[in-house]
């Protein structure tokens, strides 16, 4: 009932759309060659998929066309607030002056706040590693599965680049955002999830590739699965000094709305042409 209610909200909160509505599925009639017989029914819903790398590249290209200067492979090593502007020093010794500074460093946000801006971070984030495994295609249907484990976490199985299946994700607390990589325990967790749901059984020998990333979650709860994936702003301002906006949290699917809200938060500092 809760799943059906959630899907009803999913179907209707976005208003009119070309995406079909969700529906109930009897597994004896569909996917009986994929799922184990202990699973008798579920629900079908529709979603969209994005190439995250391509989306970021398109945003960068669009920003360049609108006059933005993009400093690739460059690190900010110092930032000083000098009255009504910021003086920012890069690792190539270039200095940039800016009337506004926005810290959108993701999982490195407090590293920037503490070590570069040299102010005390007001917000706490939790660094959570999410890992995926990629295997040869587990089934022929062009459909993704959402599998729920006994720990109440879900794992997605998604057709990937025509010949593969993408399986993930995990949630593991880490101390640093640098160089994330999947652990053996995470591999076993994802493999067991597949073997508990699918007829086809897999092992570590079936893994052809893995990748991991870090999610900067706003720390409000003890359980990593319950920490909010939303975002909050920390606006550091003084009437006589240049503002600093730190962005905590956020996710790719709402990046545009987040960016719009950044402009609203900084509206009084942005000159109107």
Describe the role of every protein-language-model region.
Residues 69-71, 208:
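General small-molecule cofactor/ligand-binding pocket signal
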Residues 72-86:
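A conserved short coil-to-beta-strand element within the FAD-binding core of flavoproteins
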Residues 103-119, 260:
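Flavin (primarily FAD) binding-site architecture
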Residues 91-100, 104:
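Core beta-strand elements of the Rossmann-like FAD/NAD(P) dinucleotide-binding domain
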Residues 39-47:
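Short, hydrophobic/proline-enriched secondary-structure or compact coil segments at domain edges
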Residues 1-31:
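Dinucleotide-binding Rossmann-like beta1-alpha1 core, especially the glycine-rich loop
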């Amino acid at each position: 009932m809760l799943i059906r209610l959630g899907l009803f909200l999913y179907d209707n909160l976005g208003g009119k759309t070309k995406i079909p509505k969700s529906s109930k599925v009897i597994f004896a009639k569909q996917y009986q060659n994929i799922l184990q017989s202990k699973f008798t029914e579920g629900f079908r819903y529709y979603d969209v998929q994005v190439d995250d790398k391509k989306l970021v590249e398109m945003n960068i290209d669009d920003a360049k066309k609108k006059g933005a200067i993009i400093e690739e492979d460059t690190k900010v090593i110092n930032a000083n607030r000098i009255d009504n502007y910021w003086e920012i020093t890069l690792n190539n010794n270039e200095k940039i002056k800016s009337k506004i500074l926005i810290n959108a460093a993701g999982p490195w946000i407090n590293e920037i706040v503490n070590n570069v801006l040299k102010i005390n971070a007001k917000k706490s984030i939790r660094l959570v590693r999410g890992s995926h495994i990629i295997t040869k295609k587990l089934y022929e249907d062009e459909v993704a599965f959402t599998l729920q484990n006994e720990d109440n976490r879900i794992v997605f199985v998604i057709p990937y680049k025509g010949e593969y299946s993408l399986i993930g994700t995990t949630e593991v607390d880490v101390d640093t955002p640098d160089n994330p990589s999947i652990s053996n325990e995470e591999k076993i967790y994802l493999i067991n999830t597949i073997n508990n749901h699918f007829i086809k059984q897999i092992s570590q020998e079936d893994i052809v590739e893995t990748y991991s990333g870090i999610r900067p979650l706003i720390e409000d709860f003890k359980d990593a699965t319950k920490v909010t994936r939303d975002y909050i702003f920390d606006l550091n301002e003084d009437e006589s000094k240049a503002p600093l906006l730190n962005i905590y949290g956020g996710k790719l699917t709402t990046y545009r709305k987040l960016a719009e809200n950044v402009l609203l938060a900084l509206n009084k500092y942005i000159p109107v042409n």
